[in-house]
UniProtKB/Swiss-Prot annotation:
This is Thiamine transport system permease protein ThiP. NCBIfam families: PRK09433.1-2, PRK09433.1-4, thiP. The complex is composed of two ATP-binding proteins (ThiQ), two transmembrane proteins (ThiP) and a solute-binding protein (ThiB). The chain crosses the membrane at residues 16-36, 58-78, 95-115, 134-154, 199-219, 240-260, 291-311, 334-354, 373-393, 404-424, 463-483, 506-526. Keywords: Cell inner membrane, Cell membrane, Membrane, Repeat, Transmembrane, Transmembrane helix, Transport. Induction: Expression is repressed by thiamine. PROSITE patterns: ABC_TM1 (PS50928). Its main location: membrane. Belongs to the binding-protein-dependent transport system permease family. GO terms for cellular component: plasma membrane. It comes from Salmonella typhimurium (strain LT2 / SGSC1412 / ATCC 700720). The keyword Cell inner membrane applies.
Length: 536
């Protein structure tokens, strides 16, 4: 029998249960809204809907190609970045990390400025007397944008694997005279192949659920994904039943991909070494030339679109656009949504990790993993699917709200939780390993422990998680695409309206402001803990 001294639910378990229950309830509510709105007899017609199967096949095909084109070059780029030290290397690695949170529409705008029919390369070809035939629309444009986003991320993750190789192995290989193919096969490949499957699965999942990229560069019915078909069913055809059916298909596919990614991630093992930082630079001439070529090609992929956003944004329309009240209303809307979503995301993530940490400390590993998985399962319901469920749920009950602030904030916070989990889970475990027994012996627990230990020791990870969540929210377009209107517009939604109305110069200014806002917000939040903040 439970007593006051032994409550039925321990206090340390309540935060995680509340956060997990909230996310599971929201997901179930969205799922039920989709299920109840799906036509009862429609499932039998799916097999006869040729266009629907074309959309499903294209979604898988473009995601597969994007993963291959991102991971294969990343293997060689990661090796080049590991072996070479050059001025600006740290800046390049930071740029590789920033592409993951770069607003999609900003990158698309830069890609169009470089590779479009009137872009930089087209002008260069014309000066050389050649004809520029590449079109950034359709499958090739989608692949180009996906590689721009995911190749740097894959390179960073594979570089971490190369840095995990024990220095003793590299020294032994150098003593044995291993070079080239043999060194790659026997030393580097066993470590890379552990990381490649989960990285490829993650990129495949992100590209499969891509929305803004396909919406901007799809180019027509032949290049449409499931998420874009959901958006079209709601925004243009207003067919909630078809949108619900498509959203269920999308959710099932994403759930399978999430579980596959989690399964593959278990194969990664950390490296143990007593020789930290030792590396064989492999200074043969052809190795140096090959590495330099790979690094230059990576710079040519990443820098021109970003430079194009800055150059095109400084045009004659700049003073006129800056004087428009609509622009600053969109800036304010984006900022308040991003900050609110970021704070909510970090709070929910800490609630999950707090209870998960306590469960792991009590050797209840399965329960702790299950609690953490509840935060990752939100990836099975991409933003457009979650927003569709909310749309149908509200439309069939109390009606759509005049202001979509609450829905957008809540949805963006949920979508950022997996990223915040990845940032905070290892620091939380380190804090437990260092101070867990001390806190237990001193009787420090609950709010007191949070204030005295976690909030002080986790200043930098908390700031980084908040920065990621805020910038991911400020650049989001998938959720706002459903609820945005003339009275509720964020900067990405305003940029999409400008691009759609062929106001390219105005759009260039907005893209520049959005880019500067993201980098400024990310930098300021990261510096909140101060230069001398400690994490131990």
């Amino acid at each position: 029998m439970a007593t006051r001294r032994q409550p039925l639910i321990p206090g340390w378990l309540i935060p995680g249960l509340c956060a997990a229950a909230l996310m599971i309830t929201v997901s179930l509510a969205a799922f039920l809204a989709l299920w109840l709105n799906a036509p009862s007899g429609a499932w039998s017609t799916i097999w006869r809907d040729s266009y629907l199967w074309h959309v499903v096949r294209f979604s898988f095909w473009q995601a597969f190609l994007s993963a291959v084109l991102s991971v294969v070059p990343a293997v060689f780029l990661a090796r080049a970045l590991y072996r070479r030290r050059f001025p600006g290397r740290l800046a390049l690695l930071r740029l590789c990390a920033m592409t993951l949170i770069l607003p999609v529409l900003v990158a698309v705008f830069g890609i169009l400025s470089v590779y479009g029919r009137q872009g930089w390369l087209a002008s260069l070809w014309q000066m050389l007397g050649l004809q520029w035939t590449f079109s950034p629309y359709g499958l090739q444009g989608i692949l180009l944008a996906h590689v721009f986003f995911n190749l740097p991320m894959a390179s960073r993750l594979l570089l971490q694997s190369l840095e995990s190789i024990p220095g003793e192995q590299r020294q032994l290989a150098a003593q044995l005279g291993m070079r080239g193919w043999h060194f790659f096969r026997f030393v580097e490949w066993p470590w890379l192949r552990r990381q490649i499957p989960p990285v490829a699965a993650l990129i495949f999942m992100l590209c499969f659920a891509s929305f803004a990229t396909v919406l901007s560069l799809g180019g027509g019915p032949q290049a449409t994904t499931i998420e874009l078909a959901i958006f079209q069913a709601l925004s243009y055809d207003y067919d909630p039943a078809r949108a619900a059916m498509l959203a269920l298909i999308q959710m099932v596919c994403c759930l399978a991909l999430v579980l596959l990614s989690q399964r593959l991630s278990k194969a990664i093992a950390p490296g143990m070494t007593l020789t930290q930082g030792w590396r064989d630079p492999d200074d043969r001439l052809h190795s140096r030339l090959t590495d330099a070529l790979l690094i230059v090609l990576a710079l040519l992929l990443l820098l021109p679109p970003l430079v194009a956003v800055v150059v095109d944004g400084v045009n004659r329309s700049l003073p006129e656009v800056l004087a428009q009240p609509i622009l600053w209303q969109a800036v304010w809307t984006s900022l308040r949504i991003a900050l609110a979503a970021g704070v909510l995301c970090v709070v929910l993530t800490m609630m999950l990790l707090w209870s998960s940490r306590e469960l792991r400390q009590r050797q209840q590993l399965f329960a702790g993993q299950t609690l953490e998985l509840s935060g990752m399962l939100i990836l099975a319901m991409p933003g457009i699917v979650l927003a569709t469920g909310f749309f149908l749920l509200l439309n069939n009950s109390v009606g759509l709200p005049e202001s979509a602030d609450g829905i957008v904030i809540f949805t963006n916070a949920l979508m950022a939780i997996p990223y915040a989990l990845k940032v905070l889970e290892n620091p939380m475990r380190d804090i437990t390993a260092r101070y867990g027994m001390l806190c237990q012996s001193l009787g420090i627990e609950g709010w007191s422990r949070l204030k005295i230990v976690e909030l002080r020791a986790l200043k930098r990870p908390l700031a980084q998680a908040l920065a990621f969540a805020c910038v991911l929210s400020i650049g989001d377009f998938g959720v706002v695409a459903l609820f945005g209107n003339d009275n509720f517009r964020t900067l990405p939604f305003y940029l999409y309206q400008q691009i759609g109305s062929y106001r390219s110069q105005d759009g260039a200014v907005t893209a520049l402001i959005l880019l500067l806002l993201c980098f400024t917000l990310f930098t300021l939040i990261e510096k909140l803990p101060g230069r001398h903040a400690k994490t131990d």
